[in-house]
Regions:
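N-terminal membrane-sensor/transducer module of prokaryotic signaling receptors
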Residues: 2-11, 15-154
Length: 154
């Protein structure tokens, strides 16, 4: 009985470890941690932070995690993944299902500074690809005149 319980527990732990390893360990906690790091970088030196975000430098490209930023006044994308053209209007973004997730991103940027909004289940390509599209969840917050976010893929 005890041996069966130990084997079952070990098997369950192995399955959990495998699922975490397969996911790359990049979920909501890692996305929120990178968002906090991005917010600190923007507050310290906005211009340098945006350059690092675009280039994926300073730890701002970790597997599928990366920050993005846009101006809260007009929604103009300033730091974006390659799948979104820099300078485009974030409000016009729609996924392959027609979901206007860009309007949700923009609305999240209008909330009080420091408030983090979760944007759920829109489809977006992973970094360096244009297809296929994957289900993504992003966390967005206002930082001065910008809104920045980091998302993870499900």
């Amino acid at each position: 009985m005890v041996r069966t319980l130990i084997i079952s527990a070990a098997s369950g732990a192995a399955l959990m470890f495998s699922a975490t390893a397969f996911a790359g360990g990049q979920g909501p906690e890692e996305a929120k941690a990178m968002l906090q790091k991005a917010v600190a970088a923007v507050k310290a030196d906005q211009t340098l932070a945006l350059i690092m975000f675009v280039k994926g430098e300073g730890g701002f490209l970790d597997g599928d995690l990366y920050p993005f930023c846009f101006r809260i006044a007009d929604g103009k994308s300033l730091a974006t993944p390659k799948a979104v053209k820099a300078g485009s209007d974030v409000k016009s973004l729609k996924d392959s299902d027609g979901s206007s997730y860009g309007l949700e991103l923009f609305a999240a940027g209008q909330k009080p500074e420091g408030e983090i909004t979760e944007i759920k289940n829109y489809k977006f390509p992973k970094p360096g690809t244009t297809e296929p599209l994957f289900s993504k969840i992003s966390f967005v917050t206002k930082v001065g005149e910008l809104a920045c976010g980091v998302g993870y893929y499900k």
